[in-house]
Regions:
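Short beta-strand His + acidic residue motifs that chelate non-heme Fe in jelly-roll/DSBH
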Residues: 54-56, 74-76, 98-100, 106-111, ...
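A generic "binding-loop/recognition-motif" signal
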Residues: 51, 60-61, 104, 113
């Protein structure tokens, strides 16, 4: 599978029509075999300006974010909700990606229409423990 602008463009209309203003695309393609399950978290996220990603943290995993098109701002917070860091990530720019440490509250703000990020996390998805909102 090519992770190209044609793929991104095919997801963009779904993101634009979504009430959330974004759409993820699961990149796990491995077929589960007896005794083995693909527990990775790898996805594309196509974002539109104005999408709101709630401030959250991942208590059990770090998160890698790499911009594949457009630009986003990754914002880190302390446990009281005060901003501690801001980083503009831009495709083709001096800083296209970031590693969000485990347990750090953060959000991602879309800066350009049709921005696309790649996200990966260390641990399997667990809906009861994966995110903790501020």
């Amino acid at each position: 599978m090519l992770l190209d602008f044609e793929l991104f463009d095919s997801i963009l209309p779904v993101a634009e029509s979504s009430p959330r203003g974004r759409m993820h695309f699961d990149l796990r393609t491995s077929i589960s075999e007896p005794g083995w399950v693909d527990s990775s978290q790898r996805m594309l996220n196509v974002l539109t300006p104005g999408t709101v990603i709630p401030v959250h943290r991942h208590p059990d995993t770090s998160e890698t974010v790499i911009v594949l098109r457009g630009a986003v701002e990754e914002v880190f917070f302390d446990s009281c909700g005060a901003v501690t860091e801001r980083h503009v990530l831009r495709y083709g720019g001096p800083c296209p990606g970031i590693q969000v440490p485990r347990g750090v509250y953060h959000t991602c703000r879309c800066l350009e229409p049709g921005s696309v990020i790649f996200e990966a996390k260390d641990r399997p998805y667990n809906p009861e423990k994966t995110e903790d909102y501020l």
